[in-house]
Amino acid sequence: MATVRRTVQAPPASVYKVLADGWTYSDWVVGTTHIRDVDPSWPAPGARLHHKAGPWPLSLNDTSTVVAVEPDRSLELRAGLWPLGEATVRITLEPAGMSATVVSMHEDFRAGPLHWVKNKINDLVLHRRNIETLRRLADIAERGTRLRAPTDRSPGSPR
């Protein structure tokens, strides 16, 4: 089981926008190498994200399914990586001031061999992986916020 937190310099709506775009998952979820398809109803409960994980030629095809969602607040997934197992991943978004978000990610294997061999080494690896996952998520959400930041570029304004 691993829980990590990161303060992202973007409002919850901006972070959620990244979560709600299933096609971005290979950009920020460590280990996901390719998104094969995203159900049109993503991120509604029951919607699936079809992905590849791991290095080629050993990559595995699987799916992740939305269990619960509260727009701009949380997303819970059942993430598959069979034959290794299946995890529950819960991402929560808490406002931190006017333009920041505390993102928490909790992941726990619930089935398969990775569930059976719970130990400190697995927890440490999962913890480090999820720190990097949230760093990548922050990069995307913060970049989107900077691109949308209002600027006054009217003629005669100082640059």
Q: What are the roles of these predicted feature ranges?
A:
Residues 37, 138-159:
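Short, highly charged C-terminal tails/helix-capping segments
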Residues 15-19, 25, 49, 66, ...:
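Hydrophobic pocket/interface hotspot
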Residues 1-44, 156-159:
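Hydrophobic ligand-binding cavity/cleft-lining segments
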Residues 12-13, 40-43, 67-72, 92-102:
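A short, structured loop/turn motif at beta-sheet edges
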Residues 78-132, 148-150:
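Beta-strand/loop substructures that line and gate deep hydrophobic ligand-binding cavities in soluble
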Residues 47-54, 75-82:
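Short beta-strand segments that buttress and anchor functional surface loops
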Residues 1-7, 13, 48, 61, ...:
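Intrinsic-disorder/low-complexity, polar/charged segments enriched in Ser/Thr/Lys/Arg/Asp/Glu/Gln
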Residues 6, 62-68, 87-95:
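Hydrophobic/aromatic beta-strand elements that line small-molecule binding cavities or substrate pockets
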